[in-house]
Amino acid sequence: MAKPALWATTAGLNSPRRDPVTPPPAAVPAEARAIGGWRRLALWPFALLLKLWGRSLRFVTTPEDLRAFTKHDEPVAIVLWHNRLFLSAEIVRRYRQGRPAYALVSASQDGAWLSAFFSLAGMRTVRGSSSRLGREAATALVGVLRAGLDVGITPDGPRGPCYDFKPGALIVARRTGAPLLLVGAEFESAWQLRSWDRFYLPKPFSRVIMRCTHVPASALDQREAAAVTIAGRLRAINPDVRKSGGGPPL
């Protein structure tokens, strides 16, 4: 599965703001593949299905976590495990006021399909990955944060191992001084794919218990130590990480 590691919603960089902010367009590397024509059109029914699927889910959270999710006075780096990415669009829509969202996807052919899908689902994309075109991708993410937008990071993407927190995931937040919002999700009923991350597909209309932890920028000064601490906190709010599996794979 290609890596969607970023989504962005408007939030004030130095002061609270409620009006949408349009970030400067990130340059798409020349090597990035694209999908167009009938192939793009063929994705539309699938994108609509997944949007309706996501909206059917029943998110449950505590008042404290809800306040952290919906705090908009500064941009944050939202961190969640790769196998929770199905929830990303709904997190933006429900908790980040549904503002325009950005997804970082690979510059490969697989990423081209994912980029086209995200576009049809109402999300915009930045192309790049940790393995190819990484410098351009990092620069684009920094630009998004400095424009006053949130970014999302999957610290075990794009190829795993599953739940292996890579210290490099903190680079963008450290360069901009943005705090982290660690996201946890516990599924009442879900399928899991036979992918490297055992990707979760919550069953329609099922309940998802959402958790989050706010980490201030000051806690990121020492990258290696911060990565160990943050990885532990992210595992703590995702209970299945401590289990051998979360359900029968598809």
Model features per residue range: what roles?
Residues 58-64, 100-103, 210:
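Generic preference for hydrophobic/aromatic residues in regular secondary structure cores
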Residues 62-64, 106, 128-131, 213-215, ...:
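Conserved beta-strand termini and adjacent loop/short-helix elements that scaffold enzyme active sites
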